[in-house]
């Protein structure tokens, strides 16, 4: 299995010849996870059979099972894990009865899936992307040096192919796996919300709001982190690809670059799609909550109310009432203005100015900054630009103005500090407490 890719018949034959199989009921899986956690606490990573028996006894207590013949049952469970290549047993004639056990790579992988991979956060993702950026930067520098010095294939494999294959690709796979685990987490949250909505409505609504908001916030935070680094990583990969164009002997690097670009595109694309899907689900739940009482065809709520009133003295309760204010989307770009005739003249402050005109003004200003940047080689401080621009517009337009400026700034260039993985400081941009977090653009 040294080749980078295998055909389906080869993989089927390989697994069949080695008789691979997995059978992990809940009790066995919990036993394996307990072993993994205990193993992480040990410095040597080695366990005695007595340790495994104690762990098995603890897991059986959690399942409230009988402890009769615990040693025999623990021995059977250990033998099953050894047979399925989840544990390795080491023994000799000098250590009879004192076998040493270590988790196999398969055992570590299975336990990691349930333990470590769920520790997915924006901080961890930032660290991973920072490592990837450093590796790709070194690989691209080595590629350019290889072109200048006309290095041989051994140089390219060691300095370019190896870090991309065994560091960058593995981190991409780790991020992809974490996204798939988050998909499962979203599904479990949906099941939890569905269960809440069938129970106590007073507690369910607040719990549903909390679950929806937490998940939406996590998805957006992670996607913002991916978007911030995605374009820069793609640019570095293109640098390496430019170095191997026309080199038939370096086809393996060109193929690897293509695979990495596809993985990165897939990760970023699915992250955005997951957000869109969750937004749709969020709206669906809110719509259901708003209309459920009106659609009470089976009189479920009215029946609950009758029962609550009937048993009030046995189970007293408080009546909570709320009236949500109607929400009006003031920034609907598709909203059609009324064209009714009006008499008189409007004051200058109330004259209508379309969003497209406003957009053109900001674009013209940003283009002027870009020309000055090219001519004088001056960096662009986005916080200062926002602060200066917002002073020229009323507070009601600050959101639209800031959004346009940020959109234009992203197209101008990049900041070298973005590759360091260090978050910039928050900078105030108006007198109402609005702040922005952005590095100085110093590379066009």
UniProtKB/Swiss-Prot annotation:
| Calcium recorded as keyword | yes
The record's InterPro entries line, in alphabetical order, gives:
Chromosome_partition_MukF, MukF_C, MukF_C_sf, MukF_M, MukF_M_sp, MukF_WHTH, WH-like_DNA-bd_sf, WH_DNA-bd_sf
One Gene Ontology molecular-function label:
calcium ion binding
Q: Where in the cell is it found?
A: Cytoplasm, Nucleoid
Presence of keyword Oxidoreductase: no
Q: One biological process GO term for this chain? A: chromosome segregation
Which residues are listed as membrane-spanning? Answer: none
Keywords of the record, alphabetical order, are: Calcium, Cell cycle, Cell division, Chromosome partition, Cytoplasm, DNA condensation
Q: What is its main location?
A: cytoplasm
Q: Where is this region: Leucine-zipper?
A: 212-240
Q: State any GO CC term.
A: nucleoid
Please give one Pfam family short name: MukF_M
What protein family does this chain belong to? Belongs to the MukF family.
Self-association or partners: how does it assemble?
Interacts, and probably forms a ternary complex, with MukE and MukB via its C-terminal region. The complex formation is stimulated by calcium or magnesium. It is required for an interaction between MukE and MukB.
As for what it does, the entry says: Involved in chromosome condensation, segregation and cell cycle progression. May participate in facilitating chromosome segregation by condensation DNA from both sides of a centrally located replisome during cell division. Not required for mini-F plasmid partitioning. Probably acts via its interaction with MukB and MukE. Overexpression results in anucleate cells. It has a calcium binding activity.
Q: Which HAMAP family match?
A: MukF
Q: What is this protein called?
A: Chromosome partition protein MukF
